[in-house]
Swiss-Prot record:
Pfam families listed in its UniProt record: TsaE
GO molecular function: ATP binding; metal ion binding
InterPro entries (alphabetical): P-loop_NTPase, T6A_TsaE
Any Gene Ontology CC annotation: cytoplasm
Organism: Rickettsia conorii (strain ATCC VR-613 / Malish 7)
Top-level taxonomic group: Bacteria
Binding site residues for ATP: E7, G34, A35, G36, K37, T38, F39
UniProt name for this protein: tRNA threonylcarbamoyladenosine biosynthesis protein TsaE
Family named by the database record: Belongs to the TsaE family.
């Protein structure tokens, strides 16, 4: 786990992760209420759509979409989903076709998702501090390697990011 000491560091990490994302990526955001999932998504969306983009939390309507240059960002908040099948009523199959998907509260549908996935786990501490881990289960020598190298070599943080690699065929990589 990496400690993000301020809102600014959380923004930096979200934008850093965004730089490695591409169409067809699925990012799962986990954490309690107030952990910063929507804030993290907002920064990813701003990276692709511009700083002045009006970003609305999908808490009440479960889905917001944003047009990036060559794909759409589907931002889901599944907190109020009653059954996993409801995700299909929210355009999920369409979202899987060449778009970037951000899912808050993904636990209810996680069993429906196939790798590769990127999980961002956030835990609120005090004074805008967060604990954060990023886990990916990309296969070896795929996007995961470039994601890890990119995050680890970033000059945006004063300390080196703690990234652990699992050597299993479908690897979990933790920040």
């Amino acid at each position: 786990m990496h400690t993000l000491n301020s809102e600014e560091e959380t923004k930096k990490l979200a934008k850093l992760l965004a730089q490695s994302l591409k169409p067809n990526d699925i990012v799962l955001l986990n954490g309690d209420l107030g952990a910063g999932k929507t804030f993290f998504c907002r920064e990813i969306i701003k990276y692709f759509c511009g700083e002045n983009t009006s970003i609305i939390s999908p808490t009440f309507n479960l889905l917001q979409t944003y047009k990036a240059s060559n794909f759409t960002i589907y931002h889901y908040d599944l907190y109020r989903l009653k059954s996993p099948e409801e995700i299909y009523e929210l355009g999920f199959e369409e979202a899987l076709n060449g778009n970037l998907i951000l899912i808050e509260w993904s636990e209810i549908i996680k069993h429906l998702l196939t790798p590769p996935l990127i999980e961002v786990n956030l835990e609120a501490l005090d004074n805008n501090k967060r604990l954060c881990s990023i886990i990916t289960n990309h296969k070896e020598n795929s996007q995961e390697s470039s994601l890890i190298d990119f995050l680890q070599d970033s000059p945006l943080f004063d300390t080196k990011l703690d990234i652990q690699r699992d050597k299993s065929p479908t690897r979990k990589v933790k920040l």
